[in-house]
Amino acid sequence: MKTVTARPLTAEAFAPYGSVADISELENLVSLADAYEGTGEAKTPVLQLVQAKAMSGSPVISQMEIHPFSSQTFLPLDQSSSLIVVCEAGEDGMPDESTIKAFLASPSQIVTYRHGVMHHRLTPLAPSGRFAMTMWQTGRGGDTVLYPLHTPVSVDISDITP
């Protein structure tokens, strides 16, 4: 099993995959323009409240997902750090497992995955975490596509302090 080491989530490190806004530094209005990126096919805005469960034990990633028509934004509602895992798509459209990166988002960070970015489901590090999620959908399905990994990936979070 391959192991990747999580590092703190920063806007600079995450820029190839989307955007990060930190509400702990909020002095004025924060614009989340990237939260509404989508294709012309995705015409229905979606806002969902999500109760996400933590993984038991050391995090092991066995699948990734992609939203081909829309960006996807998660706003934390609890004081829970979360694990963010992303990778590039290979030429065959499957996850390129050699490009997997892991980040630790603080409870004050809003994360937006750019449309077409492979990522793992949002995973809080506390027993559970509540999030508001927004994206666009087509209304005909195919808005979330799941891809299994050939080899599960373990994520080392031991060097990260939330």
From Swiss-Prot:
GO terms for molecular function: ureidoglycolate hydrolase activity; ureidoglycolate lyase activity. Pathway: Nitrogen metabolism; (S)-allantoin degradation. It catalyses: (S)-ureidoglycolate = urea + glyoxylate. GO terms for biological process: allantoin catabolic process; purine nucleobase metabolic process. NCBIfam families: PRK13395.1. Catalyzes the catabolism of the allantoin degradation intermediate (S)-ureidoglycolate, generating urea and glyoxylate. Involved in the utilization of allantoin as nitrogen source. Belongs to the ureidoglycolate lyase family. This is Putative ureidoglycolate lyase. It comes from Agrobacterium fabrum (strain C58 / ATCC 33970).
